[in-house]
Amino acid sequence: MKIDFHCHSFPAEFFRALKRYYPDVIELREDAKGLVGVWAKTPLPAWDHDARLEDIDRAGVDVEILSNPPIYSRVDEHAPELCRLTNDAIAATCRRDPKRFKAFAHLPFNNMDLALKEMARTLDELHFAGVVVTSNVGGR
């Protein structure tokens, strides 16, 4: 079995929230395939479930574990909402095809009480496979 455990997904909800809270960070565009977020001068298409299934079938991948790029550089009051809406969007993808997609949760590490609550929610209610923890949060 081939498992891709480092697969970033970019839910449209995540792009829209970034634009709302941090308009200097992302530019949103529409193209023939849908929403594209331009982040650090890199165009990133919003998640397309059917296109992703075609991609992993072509690559011979059996399961992908989805996560979002770490948003820990923005550890302000919006982090809990960004994590929750991103986790909810990724969970919706996993529900569409639970044998092919699993998820790692993002947690608002700037608020440990909320991080623990979101971890419990994603593991217990959304049935995520784990959580994302990077080497630093907010430069620490």
Regions found by a protein language model. Give the residues of each.
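Helix-coil boundary/capping segments in enzymes
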Residues: M1-R140
